[in-house]
Amino acid sequence: AGFAGDDAPRAVFPSIVGRPRYTGVMVGMGQKDAYVGDEAQSKRGILTLKYPIEHGIVSNWDDMEKIWHHTFYNELRVAPEEHPLLLTEAPLNPKANREKMTEIMFETFNVPAMYVAIQAVLSLYASGRTTGIVLDSGDGVSHTVPIYEGYALPHAILRLDLAGRDLTDYLMKILTERGYSFTTAAEREIVRDLKEKLAYVSLVFEQELETSKNSKDVEKSYELPDGQIITIGAERFRCPEVLFQPSFIGMEAVGIHETTYNSIMKCDVDIRKDLYGNVVLSGGSTMFPGITDRMSKEISALAPNSMKIKVVAPPERKYSVWIGGSILASLSTFQQ
């Protein structure tokens, strides 16, 4: 969250609401009945954590309202009734969801005006393009969204219910095979951090797997909050491999490379060349080192032989949806 015209968000925190598992015994400590974001994160040991956004779509409106309240009053410290607002939504977001979001903003927070933009379109703006296909992969959902001259092509948008949270869960599972046990919501956050710091995408998975069996080059150590040090090896690239091979977690879906290709194939034959030449990665789950080359390689294998394929991974892609929103909301034409 932040202000239009800024080049980076002012506030970045996880969409979590935590409620105490125990009753407070010390009077006057000002214990709250709910904690949001980083505070919920830091007190996770005594809280039950809930995620009000599932697969990119709000599923718990009471908790979502708490998150918005926290954003306005604690993070940005603004009065919502004084500022027009730009919100974003997942592609193919149900209409009822958008209506509920609008209702809460106008009735609970009394915002003067608001606009809801599609996340992937904003990422494309942020990369300085108006035509391209965006693979947006965050925590709960991934989408491929072809955009031509600024218009998303809804018939060709594909959704994959596979993203960061699933990768974290899979990493928890394969770490268990190594003898490290992570189970609680609090421990999942530790594994998420481990994933963000150490995971990478291999160029040729089978080859990397063979190499890792015979050498220790892949191994890295990681210090847990209690000081214990764990070692992870092949798990580093086995984890994000799920994006390319969802069958690893028992999903029947095709990987992100094939989803991108299928999305392009649903578009008019005349615009495919422009899409192949502008594949834009966006979202936190595209931050793995090696993902750009791998996407390039995999899409080239599917596309016609002579096709020029360019996969673009802007360094700020973790926040490119926000940056695109900041650009859009600061245009004078938009404000009118």
UniProtKB/Swiss-Prot annotation:
- Enzyme class, broadest EC rank: hydrolase
Ubl conjugation as UniProt keyword: no
For this protein, the Enzyme Commission number is 3.6.4.-
**Keywords annotated in UniProt:** ATP-binding, Cytoplasm, Cytoskeleton, Hydrolase, Nucleotide-binding
Q: Which SUPFAM superfamilies match?
A: Actin-like ATPase domain
Picking any one GO molecular function of the record gives:
hydrolase activity
The record's GO CC annotations read:
actin cytoskeleton; cytoplasm
Q: What does this protein do?
A: Actins are highly conserved proteins that are involved in various types of cell motility and are ubiquitously expressed in all eukaryotic cells. Essential component of cell cytoskeleton; plays an important role in cytoplasmic streaming, cell shape determination, cell division, organelle movement and extension growth.
Annotated protein name in UniProt = Actin-53
- Please report the organism this UniProt entry assigns to the protein: Nicotiana tabacum
